Amino acid sequence: MGTFLVPELIRLGYAVDVISKDDVHSDNPDLRYYQADFCNDGIRNEFLDKNYDVIINFMHYHTDVFRNIHPSLLSHTGQYFFLSSYRVYADEKVPVTEEAPRLLDVSKDAGLLASDDYAIAKCRCEDILHASGKKNWTILRPAIIYSHANLYTFKLVSLNGDLVMPRTRMGKPVVLPREAMNIHAAMTWGGDVGKMVSRLVDNPAAMGEIFTISSAEVNTWGGIAECYKNAVGLQYALASKDEFLDILSNNPEDRECQRWGLDYDRLFDRVIDNAKVLKATGLKQSDFMPIRDGLKLELEAAANTPAPFNKAASARMDSFLSKQG
């Protein structure tokens, strides 16, 4: 997300410090990079002592960790951005608005609720902010974001770029669950995410508020598969949900986590009403990149980038396809 957000912030006149594990250099006096690990308590406290006007935090926290560190995060900045996810939403309201019920509040899946799964942890961290007694936070609930800067973000249903990209380059089909093909999906170009988030910075309308960060464009997973096909020649075959999960993982615990992600997100109709973020930022839906154009742009930009490769899942995919004749 930072790949597109940082230039937007610089363009809007902000001075930006970026903390990254990568060694990055800048010739812009308003942009400084620090190679550091923000998870380290000592390093984090060093940066918090700078008392930034705004902190935009893209890290994922388990609930217990965030409960311990959120007081210092909130007390050392004027506005703290917490990265949640649109995955917190249950499947009870279409289109989805910020007031839609959350999984944590309505799910009957005891195993999910007993876990600190990604979506559940996000819900609980949101609740921690609400209970903090402060209002200098802004919660971001982004939909699926794609960008050439991270090839893992080229997603298709539950597949990540470590299967979509290498198999497409090898001319091999990917396997998708047929149950998902007519389900609506929410994917947004990273550049549009940068536009939305940058305009919430130092914005009084964003204080103590939650925003779904997404285009309102409506597509099905089948339609998005066709966008990949048109952009880079992706081929795909269909399987049942159970067959698809068997391909993703042969570890029972991990398979259950994959099932949660499929059943409680990718198989939910994700039609987004983004009126709230449009109102707060002054943007219009027409300002956003259509997914067919955005995917083509980012896939072309990533054409010469080595792709991560999930060899084990790819081998299971090959095995499944060989049995189909």
Mark where each language-model region is.
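Conserved beta-loop-beta element that borders a ligand/cofactor-binding pocket
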Residues: 126-154
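Mid/C-terminal beta-alpha module of Rossmann-like enzyme folds, strongest
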Residues: 196-261, 274, 296-297, 302, ...
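Substrate-positioning beta->alpha
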Residues: 156-165, 177-201, 208-209
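Glycine-rich Rossmann NAD(P)(H)-binding loop
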Residues: 176-183, 211-218, 229, 264-265, ...
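Short-chain dehydrogenase/reductase
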Residues: 95-126, 154-162, 183-187, 191, ...
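N-terminal Rossmann-fold NAD(P) dinucleotide-binding loop
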Residues: 2-3
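NAD(P)H-binding glycine-rich loop region in Rossmannoid oxidoreductase-like domains
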Residues: 25-28, 32-77, 82, 88-91
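Conserved Rossmann-fold NAD(P)-dependent oxidoreductase catalytic core, especially the SDR/UDP-sugar
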Residues: 70-124, 130-132, 138
